[in-house]
Structure formats: structure tokens, C-alpha cells
Regions:
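Phosphodiester-processing cores and adjacent nucleic acid-binding clamps
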Residues: 1-166
Length: 166
């Protein structure tokens, strides 16, 4: 996202950023610090300009369906998805991974639309990976390890979004 986001979009896209070594860790910490001081818009955010400036020794994964590439795919914008994939590949090279997820839930309290979206996104992501010779990783959208931690996670989300716990 650019620093000048629309008034309606404060969320940004999800992206996994990992440090390869101490230098990568320093770059990651620098970006996180700047996201709070310069990129804050409803929440701390890191834009592509910061990624370009501090990209050395970082590993990037395209993230869950909340990521830029899956969102473009789900919105029917394969052209934008491919443009984004190429931007990340050009900047991060072999340290850029396309991510797929597929975890169907039988929990009646969970969002039931996530799995079909993952299936749709995965198909297009695999096509982009083949076309541009990008490695694919299979992950899960894990936010806590133990089921009993779900309530604490819900409370944390409510605190960060300013919503009430149901």
C-alpha cells in the first residue's frame, strides 16, 4: 500500500516477513519501528517503499487470503496479482515464496467462506508459481497453538480493533 491509503482502507494486506540473519533482523526491526512512527494509519503499516529500502536478508511469503496476491485473485484481478508477484520476485529473488493454505473447518462457529476462497486462490497461485518459477510453501493460518487459547486470541483481536467481545 502507499502511505496515502484511501479513507476506507486502514487494514492493509497481510505479508510474512522473516529475517535470514542478524542483518535481516535489523532491517525487520527498522521497518517495524518506522511502521509505528511514519506508516501508522489506524495501525502500524509497512509500505513497498520501506520494503525496497530494507529488503536485504529478508524472506518474504505471500501470506494467507488476506495477502495482496490472494486478494487480487479473489477480486478477479489476475493482472494485478501477477504484477504484484513480479514486484516481489524482482526485489527478493529466491527469498520470495508464494504461499498456499487449505484448511477446511467443521467448526460451526468459524467462517465458512474461507476454505472456498483458499481453493480459488491456491489454483491461481500455483499457476503463477509455475509461470514465474517461484517456490511454493504450504502453511496454516495459525494464530494460537492450543484450542483453549482461542478466547484469549479473540480478546486480543477485540482490543486491537476496538470491538466488543460478544
Amino acid at each position: 500500500h502507499s502511505k496515502l491509503a484511501s479513507q476506507n482502507d486502514r487494514s492493509g494486506w497481510h505479508l510474512i516477513v522473516l529475517a535470514k540473519n542478524l542483518n535481516g533482523y535489523k532491517n525487520l526491526i527498522k521497518m517495524v519501528s518506522l511502521s509505528w512512527t511514519e506508516g501508522f494509519y489506524g495501525r502500524p503499516r509497512i509500505d513497498k517503499e520501506l520494503l525496497e529500502k530494507y529488503h536485504e536478508d529478508l524472506i518474504i511469503c505471500s501470506a494467507c487470503i488476506g495477502g495482496e496476491i490472494p486478494q487480487h485473485i479473489l477480486n478477479g484481478r489476475m493482472d494485478k496479482a501477477e504484477e504484484s508477484v513480479l514486484w516481489f520476485k524482482n526485489l527478493f529473488g529466491e527469498d520470495y515464496y508464494l504461499e498456499i493454505q487449505r484448511h477446511e473447518t467443521h467448526d460451526p462457529n468459524a467462517a465458512q467462506d474461507v476454505y472456498p476462497h483458499q481453493v480459488t486462490a491456491n489454483k491461481a497461485i500455483l499457476e503463477l508459481a509455475r509461470k514465474h518459477n517461484i517456490k511454493v510453501i504450504a502453511t496454516n493460518d495459525v494464530h494460537f497453538v492450543n484450542a483453549e487459547d482461542a478466547e484469549a486470541h479473540d480478546r486480543l483481536i477485540c482490543l486491537s480493533t476496538g470491538k466488543d467481545l460478544d
